[in-house]
Amino acid sequence: MRCVRAILCSCLLPVSVTLAAGNVSFDPNLPAHSLCTVEIAVLRPTQSAVGMKEVEFRAKKIGKMTATQLEHYLRKHVAPIAIGPGGFPYLLDHQHLARALLQAHAGKALYAEVKENWSKLSEPEFWARMKERDWAYLHDETGKPLSDPTSLPRTIGNMRDDPYRSLAWLVREKDGYSQTESPYAGFQWADFFRARVHLGDGTNAFDEATLEAMKVAHSPEAKDLPGYVAPPDRISH
């Protein structure tokens, strides 16, 4: 537990937005269902990558908020965490939000809810439970499975960019599919597009890829993916 407490102490610097009182600061001994504030610097990701297009969009949105607006926004987006071996908090959702806050230099902490405190488990036991709950996406930024959970980045700032995750977000924003509660739905769509849509490096690469991805998103091949939306001519009225 000393390692986490030491990091926490070093992170308590002035921030652009100071989260309001009413929540305790993160502590490795907090029980499940506790609400707290947690420094982004100590959060450990449960996925390797984010879509940087989405991160950049959210960072710009956050950058335009007043301190009061951002405070309300963060209270509406409470981050679920699981406390793992060594007392480290693992971020189970809102990884794009956490990365966007770093990008915007707008804040260094999130409101969080402890879903489970598994700090007493061994590493293998911890990851077995994480997999059982579907609380980790153990693939790299190209969609390939990780050989081991220890291959995950250790910090939010070190998460890598998966361009196809950005493409999946762009398609969802255009109603190519619906947002769902299904875990890691964006990555399922990213892998679907990865196998079917070319994403180049040019200035218009994402625009061109989005047009193509919108077509395949409505195809019969995609019907089993979370949030699938049938093409307009197939929707019964």
Question: Where are the regions a protein language model picked out?
Answer:
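Positively charged n-region of N-terminal signal peptides that target proteins for export
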Residues: 1-5
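Surface-exposed, charge/polar-rich loops and edge strands
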Residues: 24-72, 76-88, 102-237
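A generic structural signal for short hydrophobic patches within well-formed alpha-helices
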Residues: 97-98
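Boundary at the C-terminal end of the N-terminal hydrophobic targeting segment
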Residues: 18-22
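Bacterial N-terminal signal peptides
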Residues: 7-17
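Short hydrophobic beta-strand that contains or immediately precedes a catalytic carboxylate
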Residues: 90-93
